[in-house]
From Swiss-Prot:
Residues 1-31, 78-101, 142-171 are cytoplasmic. Interacts with adaptor protein complex 2 (AP-2). Belongs to the calcium channel flower family. Keywords: Cell membrane, Cytoplasmic vesicle, Golgi apparatus, Membrane, Synapse, Transmembrane, Transmembrane helix. GO terms for cellular component: Golgi apparatus; plasma membrane; synaptic vesicle. GO terms for biological process: vesicle-mediated transport. The gene is Cacfd1. It comes from the Eukaryota. SMART domains: Cg6151-P. This is Calcium channel flower homolog.
């Protein structure tokens, strides 16, 4: 009895990323974009903090915080000095792709709203792109071009038949 319970617990529910049909290479692409976004946010945030303008400093601190959160969520092995790093990463992995997209894009927009400079734009571009990648995965895979063309052709034939019936009815 305990063996079957342990086996059921080990299998557990399928993570949402796999439910949505996210391929392994796309998942790694999103993670890589998250890590690169964290690095760009951290470096740009440090440059932003070297100023006397208070909004630039606030945006720089926010960007450094974004970098830490991105690393914590996407690459918890980089944050092993934080005791709860793996717990946070597991909880983030259970989120749906659209939730990650909103979270990452929202985090990247805040410093740009605080201080619209080239440093904040370039620093948050990759972090925002990470959110966009997760958003695209939330949209899912659409049909291929051949099936789309076939559907369009069927619609066009149906429209032509309706038009022909309309003209025959007028005569």
């Amino acid at each position: 009895m305990s063996g079957s319970v342990a086996a059921g617990a080990a299998a557990g529910p399928v993570p949402p990323a796999q439910e949505e049909g996210m391929t392994w290479w796309y998942r790694w692409l999103c993670r890589l974009a998250g890590v690169l976004g964290a690095v760009s946010c951290a470096i740009s945030g440090l440059f932003n903090c070297v100023t006397i303008h208070p909004l630039n400093i606030a945006a720089g601190v926010w960007m450094i915080m974004n970098a830490f959160i991105l690393l914590l969520c996407e690459a918890p092995f980089c944050c092993q000095f934080v005791e709860f790093a793996n717990t946070v990463a597991e909880k983030v992995d259970r989120l749906r792709s659209w939730q990650k997209a909103v979270f990452y894009c929202g985090m990247a927009i805040v410093p740009i709203v605080m201080s619209l400079t080239l440093t904040t734009l370039l620093g948050n571009a990759i972090a925002f792109a990470t959110g966009v990648l997760y958003g695209l995965s939330a949209l899912g895979k659409k049909g291929d071009a051949i099936s789309y063309a076939r559907i369009q052709q069927q619609r066009q034939q149906a429209d032509e038949e309706k038009l022909a019936e309309t003209f025959e009815g007028e005569l």
